[in-house]
Swiss-Prot record:
Belongs to the class-IV pyridoxal-phosphate-dependent aminotransferase family. Catalyzes the reversible transfers of an amino group from glutamate to the alpha-ketoacid of the respective amino acid in the final step in the biosynthesis of branchedchain amino acids. The amino acids can be ranked in the following order with respect to their efficiency as amino donor: Leu > Ile > Val. Coiled coil: none annotated. Keywords: Amino-acid biosynthesis, Aminotransferase, Branched-chain amino acid biosynthesis, Pyridoxal phosphate, Transferase. This is Branched-chain-amino-acid aminotransferase. The gene is ilvE. Pfam families: Aminotran_4. It comes from the Bacteria. InterPro entries: Aminotrans_IV, Aminotrans_IV_CS, Aminotransferase-like, B_amino_transII, BCAT-like_C, BCAT-like_N, BCAT_family. The lineage of its organism: Bacteria, Bacillati, Actinomycetota, Actinomycetes, Mycobacteriales. Inhibited by ammonium sulfate at millimolar concentrations and by O-benzylhydroxylamine (Obe). Its cofactor is pyridoxal 5'-phosphate. It catalyses: L-leucine + 2-oxoglutarate = 4-methyl-2-oxopentanoate + L-glutamate; L-isoleucine + 2-oxoglutarate = (S)-3-methyl-2-oxopentanoate + L-glutamate; L-valine + 2-oxoglutarate = 3-methyl-2-oxobutanoate + L-glutamate. Homodimer. Transmembrane segments: none annotated.
């Protein structure tokens, strides 16, 4: 199969998982616990561009110990899901937006951009050989797709590499919340920041996530599930929650208003975030993208003005927030249960992804 100037070759796994093995894994897939039988690999070399597009058996890769990615972290990645609909078709949600964001991240890390058409074709190629790994319709299970690009050129000089590799791997993913949506408690980090103006916060870059691990551990030590990030300059303004964007609901019912931090260059432009903003507008809610500081959050939560808070991202879709710890203080969001607006938006978004709600924005695309 060709995509632009690239032709994909397929080398099938000699010993793929048996039907019984795969079905056992799909019953309790977890997240990132199992992987499909194959992966996509595409090479890049300066002067030649992207080439050698292949579907190959999933397995270890060979990398020179001095590969630039191992020393200077020159890599970017994406995350999206493939869903099986009731008619048997396999679809993706806004994969074109993931392709565009991967290019944007690559530009920020001085990595060659992978053309959108090649990105989309890589998804189709992997689904074609591993379609049996996509969980059945009707539940919240899906096949998680992880595309990433990393510098493979050996060398210890601090400079952009001239050789790269694109890989696409896939992992069946179970429902994020078992037994119902579980609100989380969050720890507001005042010592650490996720990103700063002019930095890499808007890129989906592994270094951002590595730098968040210490603060996440601090949150756990303080009895919280997730960390909330403040801005790097004033340490006042809410930016993100863990690796997710965050929303505040003011008021209730049809007059509810949604507020989310504006994209300042230090926030990841989440695809779920963008989708929820559109769905909120469709539902008749007022939406604002603006700065909101920790004092406003605490005061308006205490006054009952902020009635719901949730974070959003590919893995969990929407995660409600029940309790907030900030230094020595602690406060709750309303009654600590998932709110009406939160659940309505979640139901609409997951309904579109599952094919049970109308896709009025043309977000779903067939992969197989």
């Amino acid at each position: 199969m060709t995509s632009g100037s690239l032709q994909f070759t397929v080398l099938r796994a000699v010993n793929p998982a048996t039907d019984a093995q795969r079905e056992s894994m799909l019953r309790e897939p977890g997240f990132g616990k199992y992987h499909t039988d194959h992966m996509v690999s595409i090479d890049y070399a300066e002067g030649r561009g992207w080439h050698n597009a292949r579907v190959i058996p999933y397995g270890p890769i060979e990398l020179d110990p001095s590969a630039i990615v191992l020393h200077y972290a020159q890599e970017v990645f994406e995350g999206l899901k493939a869903y099986r609909w009731a008619d048997g078709s396999i679809v993706s949600f806004r994969a074109d937006a993931n392709a565009a964001r991967l290019r944007s991240s690559a530009r920020r890390l001085a990595i060659p951009e992978l053309p959108d058409a090649v990105f989309i074709e890589s998804l189709r190629q992997l689904i074609a050989v591993d379609k049996a790994w996509v969980p059945g319709a009707g539940g919240e299970e899906a096949l998680y797709l992880r595309p990433f690009i990393f510098a493979t050129e050996p060398g210890l000089g601090v400079r952009p590499a001239t050789q790269y590799r694109y890989l696409l791997i896939a992992s069946p993913a179970g429902a994020y919340f078992k037994g119902g949506i579980a609100p989380v408690s969050v720890w507001v980090s005042t010592e650490y920041v996720r990103a700063c103006p002019g930095g890499t916060g808007a890129a989906k870059f592994g270094g951002n996530y590595a730098a968040s691990l210490l603060a996440q551990a601090e949150a756990a030590e303080n009895g919280c599930d997730q960390v909330v990030w403040l801005d790097a300059v004033e340490r006042r303004y809410i930016e993100e929650m863990g690796g997710m964007n965050i929303f505040f609901v003011l008021g209730s019912g049809g007059s509810a208003r949604l507020v989310t931090p504006e994209l300042s260059g230090s926030l990841l432009p989440g695809i779920t975030r963008d989708s929820l903003l559109q769905l909120a507008i469709d539902a008749g809610f007022a939406v604002e993208e603006r700065r909101i500081d920790i004092d406003e959050w605490q005061k308006k939560a205490a006054a009952g003005e902020i009635t719901e808070v949730f974070a959003c991202g590919t893995a969990a879709v929407i995660t409600p927030v029940a309790r907030v710890r900030h230094g020595a203080s602690e406060f709750r969001i309303a009654d600590g249960q998932p709110g009406e607006v939160t659940m309505a938006l979640r139901d609409t978004l997951t309904g579109i992804q599952r094919g049970t709600f109308a896709d009025t924005h043309g977000w779903m695309a067939r992969l197989g």
